[in-house]
């Protein structure tokens, strides 16, 4: 039975990243009462937490948009739905509410709050994520070593070393190059996982790329002052006042894995209507898996609309999946 402090809504969105925020807006567009829960203290998901300054190049209508600006626009758009935000809280349990008229599910949060919803939409991205540590970085976090770059200003005039070969490493190298005194990118392999266009831009810049290498030691008096780079067994020391470890993340779906959802390689299997295998539970965005899946923000927006429209007939059996075009006059 739900407790007295249960929140009653039509749709509960789990995850407040770009896909979740657009789903929130769209739920309001369909006239639904919506609540949004996220384990992070701020809206915007990975963009806010990891790369608010990054220029995003694959969102329709924007040749380029800074991460924080995209989030601000999505938050403003979602505000039209008058959502209830439940931030810095984790969804821990889910069960059907047999006593609810026409059916509902109850989601329990880690602070004791329960949300009773006619449908649930999971837009949790990669789930809870924690950065992979830099082996030589023990004890240096916050003293010159960081995992994220929320602002470029602290790197002005510094010798910066970025460790990694993925999109984050190359994006940060490209953006810090005009700000820092020098930027060195260290990667253990010759090949890179980053987008080829970004790799080529970094290669054409003043960034020094060192491959088949690792940061084997960090030195300094209380703060980072230099690093040791080992290449093919040969070590050299170079000045560094800032290190960014962009080695990827360890993702964990957390309590979602205990809900009976069909999980495939940390992703939720959905059908073409974005339904999961559980009644009244839908999913959209990077967390989903289906044949031909492409993990892009732009794709998440479309999946959000698909999920909300199909959830509409679950929330209100008299509703239609297709609501009509928003551009049509009344």
From Swiss-Prot:
EC numbers, comma separated: 1.18.1.2
Gene3D superfamilies tied to this protein: FAD/NAD(P)-binding domain (3.50.50.60)
GO molecular function, one term: flavin adenine dinucleotide binding
Pfam families: Pyr_redox_2
UniProt entry tagged with the keyword Methyltransferase: no
Domain of life: Bacteria
Keywords assigned: FAD, Flavoprotein, NADP, Oxidoreductase
Cofactor annotation: FAD
Cofactor remark from the record: Binds 1 FAD per subunit.
InterPro entries linked to this entry: FAD/NAD-bd_sf (IPR036188), FAD/NAD-binding_dom (IPR023753), Fd--NADP_Rdtase_type_2 (IPR022890), Ferredoxin-NADP_redctase_2 (IPR050097)
Reactions catalysed, as given in the entry: 2 reduced [2Fe-2S]-[ferredoxin] + NADP(+) + H(+) = 2 oxidized [2Fe-2S]-[ferredoxin] + NADPH
Binding-site positions, FAD: 19, 38, 46, 51, 91, 129, 286, 327
The protein's assembly and partners: Homodimer.
Family, as annotated: Belongs to the ferredoxin--NADP reductase type 2 family.
Name under which the protein is recorded: Ferredoxin--NADP reductase
Protein species of origin: Nocardioides sp. (strain ATCC BAA-499 / JS614)
High-level lineage: Bacteria, Bacillati, Actinomycetota, Actinomycetes, Propionibacteriales
